[in-house]
């Protein structure tokens, strides 16, 4: 591959490529198979948006037909390295090296379509006219993480405290548990940002593989049926598949946590939502002794705790999760990207008041409330009494 100083992208997954890079580090496609000068994010045949949003109004950030997403800013792009946990990529490479898992993933991606997976969700699809406050919060999170297309969002009561990202190599969708819709503002943005991080990191396919191989049992473990059952030869064979999937699942959650943290940029919000989510209770987290919790966080790298997490959980333990988030907030990567995000998401300044030569502007001497007087009402008068319009003040001047 040759370059002329311009950025080039993988023709399959649109990852940024380095000069003379023989293959894409994200999807493994040889660069000779296709290099795109710019990442194409829309459908050129879309009659609604024209492909890259040219037919949409400036206020429309997502195409309802092809799901094209308007970038946060012109040429805005966020590399996956900005939030991906290093062990996450290593664990995915391990999964790809396991023949049965790779075969299952290829079969799932090639034969089981996304609509079939979506049909199994048993939920309500969100949109501009269906729970719009959640939908548009999801659109914002997707734009912050520079997704090219907007994933479908569903709300389901099947697993009320769960949040899933499923799909294949090319398309994904997100299922939000009904209880989690109680989150508002930055708390909801963090939750949705996590799921957009799963999409951006290519987790949807392997999440779907876990659904098919391991089922939907929460917190599946390789010793979940006891030590004697663990020593069963059939169980050992099953664990050979489960163990790498569980290891990847734990690392994938750290990547998602970092993506959500990058979306909101507020450590207190991240810690609160992770605590509420892990405990499956909103009020219980507020009753926790934070000093005692910090002691647990400091001890979370203990070898015995790490072994317990490895054998007993497909999600990271809360204390370790909080410690890793604390470390991420201290990195220059997060600080630098938050400066960029805040620059492009900052609300525009309020318009300056238009000067009207026929109006006298003054403030109440008691409460400071702004007042406006028409000059015509003062015509021929040297003095006039006016009353502050503030009901709580009412001072005569």
List the model feature ranges, each with a label.
Residues 2-167, 281-282, 334-338, 348-373, ...:
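Hydrophobic or amphipathic, alpha-helical segments that drive membrane association/targeting
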Residues 171:
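A short alpha->loop->secondary-structure connector
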């Amino acid at each position: 591959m040759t370059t002329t100083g311009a950025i080039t992208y993988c023709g399959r997954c649109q990852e940024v490529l380095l000069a003379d890079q023989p293959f894409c580090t994200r999807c493994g496609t040889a660069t000779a198979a296709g290099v795109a000068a710019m990442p194409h994010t829309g459908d050129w045949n879309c009659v609604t948006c024209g492909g890259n949003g040219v037919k949409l109004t400036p206020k429309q950030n997502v195409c309802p037909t092809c799901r094209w997403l308007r970038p946060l800013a012109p040429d805005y792009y966020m590399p996956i390295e900005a939030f991906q946990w290093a062990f996450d990529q290593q664990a995915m490479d391990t999964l790809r090296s396991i023949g049965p898992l790779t075969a299952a993933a290829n079969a799932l991606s090639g034969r089981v379509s996304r609509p079939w997976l979506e049909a199994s969700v048993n939920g309500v699809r969100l949109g501009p006219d269906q729970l719009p406050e959640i939908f548009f919060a999801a659109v914002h999170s997707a734009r912050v993480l520079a997704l090219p297309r907007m994933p479908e969002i569903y709300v389901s009561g099947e697993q009320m405290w769960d949040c899933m990202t499923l799909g294949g190599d090319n398309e994904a969708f997100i299922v939000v548990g009904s209880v989690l819709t109680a989150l508002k503002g930055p708390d909801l943005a963090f939750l949705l940002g996590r799921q957009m991080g799963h999409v951006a990191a290519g987790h949807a396919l392997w999440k779907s593989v876990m659904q098919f191989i391991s089922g939907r049992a929460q917190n599946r473990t390789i010793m979940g049926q006891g030590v004697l059952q663990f020593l069963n030869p059939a169980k050992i064979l099953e664990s050979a598949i489960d163990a790498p999937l569980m290891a990847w699942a734990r690392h994938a959650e750290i990547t998602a946590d970092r993506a959500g943290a990058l979306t909101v940029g507020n450590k207190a919000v991240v810690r609160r939502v992770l605590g509420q989510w892990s405990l499956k209770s909103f009020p219980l987290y507020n009753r926790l002794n934070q000093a005692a919790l910090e002691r647990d966080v400091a001890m979370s790298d203990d070898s015995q705790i790490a072994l317990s997490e490895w054998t007993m959980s497909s999600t990271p333990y809360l204390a370790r999760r909080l410690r890793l988030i604390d470390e991420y907030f201290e990195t220059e990567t997060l600080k630098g990207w938050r400066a960029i995000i805040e620059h492009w998401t900052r609300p525009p300044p309020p318009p300056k008041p238009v000067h009207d030569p026929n109006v006298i502007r003054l403030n109440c001497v008691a409460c400071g409330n702004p007042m406006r007087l028409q000059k015509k009402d003062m015509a021929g008068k040297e003095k006039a009494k006016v009353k502050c319009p503030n009901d709580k003040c009412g001072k005569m001047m």
